Amino acid sequence: MALLGPRTALALSLALAAVLPACAAGPEVQGNPSPDGGGFVTIPDGGAVTSCRGNRDGTIARSEVVFVPGVEVRYRINPPNTLANVAPRGAPNPDGTRTWDFADRTGEAVTLSLSTSAGQWWQSRFPAAQYASRLDPRSPNLGVYRAGDDSVELLGLVAPGESTMTVVPYEPGVPVLRFPLTLGTTWTADSTTRDAQVEGTPVASRDRYTFVVDARGTVRLPELTFTDALRLRIELTQMFAAGPGVRKIQYLWLVECYGEVARMTSRDGEVDPDFTQAVEFRRLGL
């Protein structure tokens, strides 16, 4: 189990670099988009002032995803080793969009932040990396990322400290976001781990990811309502050198300039896209 557990947590937390855009413009925003569908979101605590302009046109362009190291984002999440009751389908609207009501305040308050790769102990293992952030607020391990002109790649996982002996590189990196994102966008990614260790134990896996932007609509949170969110479905199939494989489904709700505002991750072995229990249910909140 030492072989499978940590490695499984890596890929299934995946958290899609959507954590990263959220770190750029979470609850720290000042000002809201205007009623006509446009507007600026200003990010005040990332050093130099950074702005992002969203137009709520149903498409998330690369320019509508910003990365500001040091910005903190707060989420509500179910406690470790619990299952949250969820409804990923939401309610249908007459215009074909959907409404997801995530206004429930239950769960623990957690904080995530984005850091740069400069000066990190693992920098030499990931020379192309730019950023790092925890994959799961309930675990210390970090996802390592590269943000390009048309995608954000997950390059691997590391522990915060070198003494833990956790380094899991992906070959090739997994494009967890591809731009532009709009309803119907889909892509797949295959990746393997080589020369990887989790707490000093060698690990190896072959992973296949399928990404689909499969819905658009309104997300209601305790403090905020987003009227033009995209839902990204990720299906992961993971095969190990020893032991059974793993399959999971994850949903991310993405918004221009805010990034990820909600997430649901199914239990292992889930095949129903309308699953009703999640090992992780995360919502942006104070």
Specify the residue positions occupied by each region the protein language model found.
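Bacterial N-terminal signal peptides that target proteins for export
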Residues: 1-14
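Short, structured coil/loop segments at alpha-helix boundaries
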Residues: 12, 154, 255-257
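C-terminal motif of bacterial Sec signal peptides marking the signal peptidase cleavage site
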Residues: 20-22
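Acidic, serine/threonine-rich low-complexity disordered tracts
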Residues: 26-35, 39-126, 189-286
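Extracellular-facing segments of soluble proteins and assemblies that are Gly/Ser/Thr-biased and enriched
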Residues: 120-208, 212-213
